[in-house]
């Protein structure tokens, strides 16, 4: 076993620990994130860079991924919106039966013609990424952004809770 891939939701610290403590200490754990709308990934693993607990290794070849605050400024070590600053090979060109209005509003309105994917993310000092979930599923009480993953992590520590659903 050389590589384990993970996708579908953010890979939490506990999952990294489980893989390295119970499956194999020297396996390459490659988490990735993208979308069905792009038929691909924005960020993911590669076989030559180090793997850091809780981080996705970096952006995928051909993707100019960045993290923007609400003013469109690049962030490092702060949470913000996942954006792709240049066109990419799998970028959809339009929506079916749309004159371009819905397509532009879905991806390009927020940051003036920069693709905004709608994921809440952090770029680390290692040039890795941590995904916190969908930005439209992020709660913002008193100006403090809380992703649903953080709420689930706390709620699921309660033995009496079998299943939960966070609604903002």
Segments predicted by a language model, with ranges:
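Gly/Ser/Thr-rich phosphate-binding loop
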Residues: 1-51, 64
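Generic beta-strand/beta-sheet core signal
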Residues: 6-7, 32, 41-45, 68, ...
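Short, P/G- and charge-enriched loop/turn segments at secondary-structure junctions
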Residues: 49-55, 105-107
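Short coil-to-beta-strand transition motifs
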Residues: 56-62, 115
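Conserved ATP/PPi-binding loop(s) of AMP-dependent carboxylate-activating enzymes
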Residues: 59-60, 73-111, 146
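AMP-binding/adenylate-forming catalytic core of the ANL superfamily
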Residues: 88, 102-105, 113, 118-168
């Amino acid at each position: 076993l050389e590589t384990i891939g993970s996708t579908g939701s953010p890979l939490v610290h506990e999952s990294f620990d489980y893989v390295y403590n119970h499956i194999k200490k020297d396996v390459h754990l490659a988490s990735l994130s993208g979308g069905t709308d792009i038929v691909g990934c924005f960020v993911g693993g590669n076989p030559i860079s180090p793997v850091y607990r809780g981080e996705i290794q970096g952006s995928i070849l051909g993707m100019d991924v960045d993290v923007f605050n609400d003013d469109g400024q690049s962030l490092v070590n702060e949470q913000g919106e996942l954006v792709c600053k240049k066109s990419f090979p799998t970028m959809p060109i339009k929506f079916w039966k749309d004159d371009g209005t819905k397509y532009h509003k879905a991806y390009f309105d927020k940051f003036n013609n920069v693709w905004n994917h709608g994921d809440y993310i952090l770029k680390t000092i290692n040039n890795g990424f941590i995904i916190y979930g969908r930005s439209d599923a992020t709660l913002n009480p008193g100006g403090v952004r809380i992703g649903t993953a953080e709420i689930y992590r706390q709620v699921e520590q309660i033995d009496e809770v079998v299943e939960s659903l966070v609604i903002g």
